[in-house]
Design a protein with these regions (language model features):
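Generic structural signal for well-ordered alpha-helices
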Residues: 70-73, 94-99, 123-127, 148-151, ...
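Radical SAM enzyme [4Fe-4S]-AdoMet core and its adjacent flexible, acidic
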Residues: 133-288
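C-type cytochrome heme c attachment motif
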Residues: 49-53
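Flexible mid-to-C-terminal extensions adjoining Fe-S/redox cofactors in radical SAM and related proteins
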Residues: 1-25, 262-303
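Sterically constrained small-residue positions within well-ordered secondary structures
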Residues: 32-34, 75, 101, 131, ...
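Core AdoMet radical
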Residues: 38, 46, 56-67, 78-92, ...
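N-terminal [4Fe-4S]-dependent radical SAM core
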Residues: 1-42, 47, 58, 248, ...
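Short, flexible, glycine/charge-rich loop motifs used to bind or transfer phosphoryl groups or to couple energy/partner
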Residues: 29-31, 71-74, 127-129, 251
Length: 303
């Protein structure tokens, strides 16, 4: 496996590999990071897909966040990873932004809905951006695994991960994806915006699907090349109960706000996570100033 970089962050040595794998090493009992290893960056609320459970309330008339003029982008450390939502219609300044991040050695991963991914113009854009090393990883939010030649098309793109939501994705969808050497990311269900409305009238469906995921997890893991989870899914699926202390230490990537945090370019705020009720204005802050605010709030027990 090709190594991209190794760097020191606080008391931790981080190594990045070509396939997206990240390793942390420290001689101390706990990892302590001076700067954020990664950020989840919401760049747009404009999307024509209309998912019933969208936690961000995206719509065709939603606004794009500006991608220029932010001091925190200018001050990001090399090899910081950012995950951005790439929706249709795309922001007009997305390509200059990707080139800017590339020059700063910031690693950009994108999430795109399957309906958009299957469009020829979107796949062409992604293919060219990946070839130029402007985008490292692609997360595809699943809508219908049986669509056209979806699975074979996905496998043409390196470092691609299928994103599914606990409570939304059905057993039939997962079964159809099994056995194709795919990577799967399971996200927790967020009861925000349309996600709350959907849960209010479909809570039985959501909870039954979460229970099914939890009970069939071993079989699901065996059906994919890699299965990973965000922190909310880890909580909803009670993953800590399945692991002993040593396994948990190796598996768990860290609490929200200790190694990563959330940035919303549409609203111009940042927070510990996208679920956090407490937000802070970005203003003219550097990335390290933002991360320090999040870490200090964690120490005080805020949020």
């Amino acid at each position: 496996m090709k190594r991209i970089a190794t760097y020191k962050n606080g008391n931790t040595y981080t190594t990045l590999y070509e396939d997206g794998t990240k390793e942390h090493f420290t001689m101390d009992d706990d990892f302590k990071f001076d700067f954020a290893e990664s950020c989840d960056v919401q760049i747009s609320q404009c999307c024509d897909n209309g998912c019933e459970w969208c936690y961000y309330g995206c719509s065709p008339t939603g606004q794009h966040g500006k991608l220029t003029g932010w001091k925190f982008f200018e001050t990001m450390h090399p090899y910081t990873e950012i995950a951005i939502n790439l929706q249709c219609p795309m922001p007009e300044d997305i390509l200059p932004f990707l080139w800017k991040m590339h020059r700063q050695k910031v690693i950009v991963n994108v999430t795109v809905n399957q309906n958009h991914f299957m469009r020829g113009d979107v796949r062409e854009f992604l293919g060219e951006a990946i070839a130029e090393d402007l985008i490292k990883g692609v997360g595809i939010s699943l809508t219908n695994p049986k669509q056209d030649d979806f699975i074979n098309i996905v496998k043409q793109y390196p470092n691609t991960v299928i994103h599914v939501i606990a409570g939304v994705t059905s057993p039939e969808d997962i079964d159809y994806l099994k056995g194709h050497d795919l990577k799967l990311l399971i996200l927790g269900y967020k009861k925000l915006e349309r996600g709350k409305k959907y849960y209010d009238h479909s809570s039985t469906i959501v909870e039954d699907n979460i229970k099914w995921l939890e009970s069939d997890l071993d079989e699901i893991i065996n059906g994919f090349k890699v299965v990973s989870f965000d922190n909310l899914a880890i909580e909803q699926l009670h993953l800590k109960d399945r692991l002993d202390e040593k396994e948990w230490e190796m598996f768990y990537g860290g609490d929200d706000g200790t190694v990563t945090f959330f940035i919303d370019l549409v609203k111009g705020v940042f927070a510990k996570s996208s679920l956090s009720p407490i937000t802070y204005p970005i203003g003219d802050k550097t990335i390290d100033e933002m991360f320090k605010i999040i870490k200090d709030a964690n120490k005080k027990g805020s949020d």
